[in-house]
Design a protein with these regions (language model features):
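Conserved G1/Walker A P-loop phosphate-binding module
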Residues: 1-98
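Short, charged/polar micro-motifs that form catalytic or ligand-binding hotspots
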Residues: 5-13, 89-92, 108-122, 144-151, ...
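Conserved beta-strand elements of beta-rich interaction domains across eukaryotes
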Residues: 13, 88-90, 103, 178-179, ...
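Switch II of P-loop NTPase G domains
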Residues: 67-129, 137-143, 156
Length: 326
């Protein structure tokens, strides 16, 4: 079975695993009448179910913590989360491999092997989901953005990994823990502007002459819990601890827009299928045949991908021609 590789990207604690869990949980809720099915393999299902339980128990206390247990392990021990994609009631015809990894691989003390592991992910993966800790970006005028999100380090990684690209890539900036900043159109607009400013060097890199034709970049804020908002920052030994609170005592788990990264991913894949150049792009050469053989699957993917948001904090930063399917 053909596969598409996607990696999460971000330092420890920003919300990579939380984001992946929310994407998994909400797909079924948002698929609606679309004839698509996303089926995790047994191990992926078991792990993500455990993470989902953790995510929902954040609401057991009125003051919630910031996230769930992150990923741990050495490079050779890590596994990707594997989902089969196809029509409902049929065997999947494409595998989506989502790679998660410990954010500690970005730490100064990380071994060369761990650093190389992350670089290889960026080189090999079709799409990258950059999890952004929104409170660190937004609060106290972004005081903790560099400390938590490490934007310069992320930029340096792409400088190396995206040299001499021979095929298109999709980069998704995904602010998480962002419930507070999506309460109004004005605050959502400010969140988007802060993403542009906080990652300006990386966006400028993507906008360079060599990368502009090959990199599509979008912003998709994901409310991974939906019913908690940022409350305050406590500091201990100069280390920030972000605190959150439920919007009410009886608030329940209610994630919002967590399927949007997947919509953009499938839109990107569909465009590559349509593009006649894809036969010369090695990692995508199979796409024309994959969807070409199954009209109904193509229609289902197209329907799901058509609902990508582009306002109220969402934006297509560049690469419209890599995402335009009509």
């Amino acid at each position: 079975m053909h596969e598409i590789k996607i990696t999460m990207l971000g330092p420890s604690g920003v919300g990579k695993t939380t984001l992946l869990t929310a994407i998994y949980e909400q797909f079924e809720s948002n698929i609606g009448k679309t004839n698509l099915q996303l089926t995790p393999d047994e191990e992926s299902s078991a792990i993500l179910q455990e993470r989902l339980v953790e995510l929902k128990t954040l609401l057991d206390d009125f003051e919630a913590t910031g996230g769930i247990q992150g990923t741990e392990g050495e490079p050779e021990e890590l596994r990707s989360f594997i989902f089969g994609l196809g029509q409902k009631g049929q065997k999947p015809s494409l595998q989506l491999h989502f790679q998660d990894y410990p954010g500690g691989y970005h730490a100064a003390k990380a071994t060369p092997e761990k650093r190389q592991f992350v670089k290889s992910l960026l080189t090999d993966c079709v799409a990258v989901l950059i999890a952004i800790d929104a409170p660190a970006l937004m609060e106290q005028n972004g005081k903790w953005h560099e400390f938590i999100n490490r934007p310069q380090q992320m930029t340096d990684l792409f400088k190396t990994a995206y040299q001499d690209l021979d095929s298109p890539r999709l980069v998704i900036f995904a602010p998480v823990k962002c419930e507070k900043y999506l309460q109004s159109e004005a605050s959502a607009k400010e969140l988007l502007q802060r993403v542009r400013e906080g990652y300006s060097k990386l966006i400028d890199l993507f906008n360079s002459a060599n990368l502009l034709p090959k990199v599509a970049a979008v912003v998709t804020p994901v409310q991974t819990v939906g019913s908690v908002v940022f409350s305050r920052i406590d500091t201990n030994n100069s280390t920030p601890h972000f605190r959150f609170r439920k919007i009410s005592h009886d608030a329940v788990y209610n994630p919002q827009n967590s399927e949007q990264p997947l919509r953009y991913l499938l839109r990107f894949i569909l465009k590559l299928h349509i593009d006649t150049r894809s036969r010369s792009w090695g990692i995508f050469s199979f796409l024309r045949d994959w969807l070409g053989r199954d009209y109904h699957l193509k229609q289902a993917v197209s329907q799901f991908a058509s609902e990508c948001k582009t306002n109220n904090g969402f934006a297509l930063l560049q690469g419209e021609d890599l995402l335009k399917i009509s």
